[in-house]
């Protein structure tokens, strides 16, 4: 539950005591952040899309980390000196960035899927990737998909969410071809699926020599 605006003075004093005792500000004040995310993403409303670019208060923990605290009053929140409507109860909130693991869970990507790149690149790939369980549900209706081995050509493969979905369905993949140009996506795919055959830029299919050349390279 958010902190009641009427009790701010009392609560702020209590927060100082907690910060001194524990070295951090407990996350109980953030309704979206009480526990680590373990499930897929719920439907989000536009009113819930708030960034953490400006804070009405800043708490500094024992290790020097600064934690922004936002105040919601009358259904409005102030960001960079401007007020915006928001559907939260009045009070103070700690709004934090999701971890990479939490983003994976929202996209129903297994926790075991590894990113051998920076968190920044991981966030980009997850944002550009599929919600795996949705794709798996759609492909589950493909006739005969799990009855015999299959060869896969994945265009604009990204981080190979299609491969993850096929794995969830128990599909026997004999060979997985991928077209992709982003070096971080390719690096991540090859880290998790080293048997993937990378075919480069998808636009090479316009080249008359592309098919025999690529076929010869992967045989």
Regions found by a protein language model. Give the residues of each.
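Class I SAM-dependent DNA methyltransferase catalytic core
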Residues: 1-153, 168-169, 181-184, 215-216
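Core alpha/beta nucleotide-donor-binding catalytic domains of modification enzymes
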Residues: 148-219
